[in-house]
């Protein structure tokens, strides 16, 4: 499609390819996290520089944006959502919640703009977003201080997990 794209390959227990799908727009789209969902599909999360183009049907807000794509058990897109502010927003972790929605964890350099309701306090702050089962934002929260704070699945500072 464009630069980098999401590439998903489903394999069986013997390593045989069952299906594969490339999803992206006309610029760079980088997949950083995925999880099987309770309905047997998958939720894909990453960051995108693409505007509406190719498979991407959501606008960009400026710089990198969170890009969430829900696919079914055969790899077909069910829905997608792009969210962010006017600067750089990088999605690093996604977990399904007990209500069928998702909690997203990443970091942001965006001030109030687009989907961001709070200013960035440092260079990058944690940006936590709760979405419902169809990808609609329910709430979002910026957590940070006057330093760089990064959120990703392997971080010892902040892990996005459900307890």
Please identify what each model-predicted range represents:
Residues 1-163:
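A sequence-level/structural motif corresponding to short, flexible coil/turn segments enriched
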């Amino acid at each position: 499609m464009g630069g980098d794209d999401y590439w998903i390959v489903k394999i069986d227990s013997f390593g045989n390819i069952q299906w594969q799908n490339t999803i992206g727009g006309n610029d760079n789209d980088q997949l950083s996290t995925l999880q099987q969902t309770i309905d047997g599909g998958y939720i894909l999360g990453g960051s995108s520089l693409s505007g509406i183009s190719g498979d991407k049907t959501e606008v960009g807000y400026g710089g990198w944006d969170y890009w969430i794509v829900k696919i079914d058990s055969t790899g077909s897109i069910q829905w997608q959502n792009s969210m962010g502010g006017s600067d750089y927003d990088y999605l690093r972790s996604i977990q399904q919640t007990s209500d069928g929605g998702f909690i997203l964890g990443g970091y942001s350099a965006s001030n109030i703009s687009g989907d961001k309701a709070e200013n960035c306090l440092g260079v990058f702050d944690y940006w936590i977003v709760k979405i419902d089962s169809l990808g609609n934002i329910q709430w979002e929260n910026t957590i940070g201080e006057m330093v760089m704070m990064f959120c990703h699945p392997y971080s010892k500072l902040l892990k996005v997990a459900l307890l």
